[in-house]
Amino acid sequence: MTDISIEDINELVASQLGVRVVTAHDRLMEDLGAEFADVANIIAAVEEKYHIVVKESEIARIFTPADLLQLVEKKVV
């Protein structure tokens, strides 16, 4: 199993959004200013990095990097 940390997810989100600091509970849209296309790019980067597939229905439940980490941890084996 691949070890995935919140720091890994925060760095990925920060890189995709072009921001310096991201915390686990920052809301992607409200706090970090992400738009739907940005979230789609974040999901695509996560899928590529961790070799997973995120369903459209799952995307609707991702509000923070912590939510994203929880989803990735469930899918990575």
Regions found by a protein language model. Give the residues of each.
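Thiotemplate assembly-line natural product biosynthesis machinery
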Residues: 1-22, 74-77
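Phosphopantetheine carrier-protein modules
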Residues: 14-33, 49-61
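C-terminal structural segments of small proteins and small subunits
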Residues: 53-77
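Conserved alpha-helix in the HATPase_c
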Residues: 41
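Two-component histidine kinase catalytic core, primarily the HATPase_c
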Residues: 38
